[in-house]
């Protein structure tokens, strides 16, 4: 089967999962749609996917659910028509304060970090800051995702057990959930399984289990 059919099914399911996440009270949903490396795929597949992006997103989805739309990545690599579509959607949904739904398009986490390093280097070179001023917060402020919190949970579908150059900096303390189900078939039941798995974990952020339990008792 042509992979473009899979992309179409995946985008259709994205609408379903976005609606479900809204109902569950999720505040931030970020989806890896297209990596910079994906430009190396056959030209017909890339062109078809760009066409799907142009035709898929229905504004009603965002209007009905109070969802703001965002895009992160090296957007200037995308066709101008796709850039215009994505920026228009950001502008049209900017007033919504429910869930923030972000699409990673033309995204590479390594490139994102390199880009942040270049911005910071220029500031040092121009005398706007010194090397000693650089810390984790400095880097985070110059990432494409600087406006959103780090993810609590990363879900990887399709039986893959890698994160494929996605949010490498941001996922330092994220919980990972891997499943064999492919994204087009990722259902409400699968989403609930992922969330329940996350809820049953103890996030320690470098502390001991005893420390976390003591902190919980104080609440």
Place the predicted regions along the sequence by residue:
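Flexible, compositionally biased loop and terminal segments
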Residues: 1-219
């Amino acid at each position: 089967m042509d992979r473009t059919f899979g992309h179409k099914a995946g985008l259709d399911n994205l609408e379903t999962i976005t609606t479900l996440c809204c109902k569950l009270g999720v505040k931030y949903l970020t989806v890896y749609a297209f990596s910079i490396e994906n430009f190396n795929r056959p030209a017909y597949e890339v062109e078809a996917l760009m066409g799907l992006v142009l035709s898929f997103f229905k504004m009603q989805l965002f209007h009905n659910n109070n969802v703001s739309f965002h895009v992160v990545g090296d957007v200037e690599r995308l066709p101008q028509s796709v850039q215009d579509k994505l920026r228009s959607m950001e502008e049209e949904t900017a007033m919504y304060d429910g869930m923030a739904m972000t699409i990673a398009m033309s995204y590479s986490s390594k490139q994102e970090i390199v880009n942040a390093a270049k911005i910071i280097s220029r500031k040092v070179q121009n005398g706007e800051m010194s090397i000693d001023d650089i810390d984790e917060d400095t880097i985070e402020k110059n990432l494409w995702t600087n406006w959103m919190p780090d993810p609590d949970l990363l879900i990887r579908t399709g039986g893959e057990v890698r994160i494929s150059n996605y949010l490498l900096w941001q996922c330092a303390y994220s919980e990972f959930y891997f499943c064999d189900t492919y994204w087009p078939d990722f259902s409400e039941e699968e989403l609930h399984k992922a969330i329940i798995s996350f809820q049953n974990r103890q996030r320690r952020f470098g502390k001991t289990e005893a420390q976390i339990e003591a902190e919980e008792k104080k609440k």
